[in-house]
Amino acid sequence: MTTSKPHEENLSPLSYRAAGVDIDAGERLVENIRPYAKRTLRPEVLAGIGGFGALFEISRKFNNPVLVAGTDGVGTKLKLAFESGRHDTVGIDLVAMSVNDILVQGAEPLFFLDYFACGKLDVDTATLVVKGIAAGCEQAGCALIGGETAEMPGMYPEGEYDLAGFAVGAVEKDRIITGTTIKAGDAVLGLASSGAHSNGYSLIRKIIEKNNVDLSADFHGRALIDVIMAPTRIYVKPLLELMRQVPVKGMAHITGGGLLENIPRILPEGVTAVLKKETWEMPPLFAWLQREGNVADNEMHRVFNCGIGMAVVVAPEYIDAAAQLLQSKGEIAWRIGTIREQRADEPRTILE
């Protein structure tokens, strides 16, 4: 009986790098991002980037804190980042989607963690992404205390990656905002968005593809790609200040589903929000998308924010003070509607 000799190439030693995972690249990334993460640190951070787990001490300024957690991604906006080579702002989008979500319950964002997954780690690209994440954390006032970089050969096409983010905040138990006190007669304030934010990009990409759009073309004085890729606005600092000075009854982060599906999430039974479309300025991007895609009006308001990134409900006597405060903090705010008693068989939010 004879046995075949092993092929000569099978005698060559294998390594993790040969299998597609570069540990050294991962370590270079950690060193690259460390100074960006350091800029986001808060006094409560006891241990951050580089350890097995991050440590965060709850501040004594809270008497009876409730932790509020949120997680989200950036969606198919990433596809446009890959195609355009613009990786520096999607990290801001990632932070915005989670911190704006937990903010609506009254929470101050405390810390943030990210998950970056790819088939082959490009250190320069990943550094740009995490630099954006750190910039978003600075805007939100929360600490970037950790994350995970997963290099998984064969899982993603070359040059592509996916992102997920996780935000944790805190709110005093007796100051949680639930929307339960909203009643007929209350006013709805809308805060301007910076663009499409991070929702509706599958439709945006379809419109671009169908019309063979030149993304470098001028669009109201800017390259169209710059307008489409504008990062999601982070509303944390102005709205935390608003909550300190004005009794806020409810807030809705206008994401997927638009005004029509997000405002009902904060309304108690028996009331409807009536919004007037002429009360705010819809950015040119949305008119362009509607025209180029032949998108129905109702569909536009179910997919996109259409110019309103956050809705705030206050009693009518506070509407002027709230608008003035927000405008003093750099926000554009309009009174966009009113709460009324719900009529038979009508939806929870109406656009007129």
UniProtKB/Swiss-Prot annotation:
GO terms for cellular component: cytosol. GO terms for molecular function: ATP binding; phosphoribosylamine-glycine ligase activity; phosphoribosylformylglycinamidine cyclo-ligase activity. Pfam families: AIRS, AIRS_C. The keyword Ligase applies. Keywords: ATP-binding, Cytoplasm, Ligase, Nucleotide-binding, Purine biosynthesis. It catalyses: 2-formamido-N(1)-(5-O-phospho-beta-D-ribosyl)acetamidine + ATP = 5-amino-1-(5-phospho-beta-D-ribosyl)imidazole + ADP + phosphate + H(+). SUPFAM superfamilies: PurM C-terminal domain-like, PurM N-terminal domain-like. Gene3D superfamilies: PurM-like C-terminal domain, PurM-like, N-terminal domain. Its EC number is 6.3.3.1. InterPro entries: PurM-like_C_dom, PurM-like_C_sf, PurM-like_N, PurM-like_N_sf, PurM_cligase. Its main location: cytoplasm. GO terms for biological process: 'de novo' IMP biosynthetic process; adenine biosynthetic process. Pathway: Purine metabolism; IMP biosynthesis via de novo pathway; 5-amino-1-(5-phospho-D-ribosyl)imidazole from N(2)-formyl-N(1)-(5-phospho-D-ribosyl)glycinamide: step 2/2. It is found in: Cytoplasm. Belongs to the AIR synthase family. This is Phosphoribosylformylglycinamidine cyclo-ligase. The lineage of its organism: Bacteria, Pseudomonadati, Pseudomonadota, Betaproteobacteria, Nitrosomonadales.
